Amino acid sequence: MLKRRLRNYDINDIKHPEDCEILDGLNKIPFFKGFLNNTIVPIREAYNEVESYGDGWNITAQSSPQIYQCLKEACGILGVKKVPKLTSEWFYAPTSFSAGNENFRIVISSGAIDLFEKEELIFFLGHELGHYICGHKPYQMLLEALYMPFIDNPSVKMWSTIVKVPLLDWYRKSDFTADRVGVLCCQNIDVALRVMIKRAGLPKKCYNEINIKAFLKQAFDFENHHVGNLDKIAKALSLRSCEYPWMVQRAAYLYEWYRSGEYQKIINKYKAI
């Protein structure tokens, strides 16, 4: 399938409403983003660079050309001119994260590279590029810095705990936006859902019988049936301890957005001529 290249798009057309509202509020705090870009961001960039070079496989056009080509393709579709650095680390759960703003680097697990097909990997990389495009990284790196080893002073710990709870709530919601960017990158909702099914725990020996309809049924059953007061309390308490939103929830939110027609509107509106 020939993918449409997207250009001059308004990222606010893509963002999840809750992510957009919180991010706009953070961006309006005077000097806050500038402060982060001059303090927390360089520290996290340096920390990640040292860790990635010292304990990971640096993926380049020379070292791993096929994987690097997936990243170049994702950047080309989304109009990201500066291709970020890419590292693979040994961990078999299919995960990824990114750090940096000016010096942006994506770190992807070896398991993701092994378990995902090419188009699935493009969705996965597009998700991380989405965090970068949307301006999430300074605030995400602030939250990540609060978990770093040097945060051991009691007064700093108390302050960081107050900041962590609302910031972690936004951190999870930012993934809903990044998933949208991911599917705009791979341009196939089934590819995005296959990634989520694999990450949700489908055994590798069942990959040849992935049932997307069954997963979507599970997702919508979860959203529609677990709505009692006790269920709501259990959901809230469970989510507070999670770094990321549940895969089933992410699938439901992404599919609802796709089915609403917003995905196609963005493709039609911002496709390169």
Summary of predicted features, one role per range:
Residues 62-66, 74, 78-80, 156-224:
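Short helix/loop segments within enzyme catalytic domains
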Residues 102-106, 157-160:
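Short, conserved phosphate-binding/catalytic loop or strand-edge motifs used
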Residues 141-162:
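Divalent metal-dependent catalytic cores for phosphoryl transfer on phosphate-bearing substrates
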Residues 62, 107-123, 166-173:
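Short pre-active-site segment immediately N-terminal to the catalytic Zn-binding motif
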Residues 128-148:
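Catalytic Zn2+-binding segment of zinc metalloproteases
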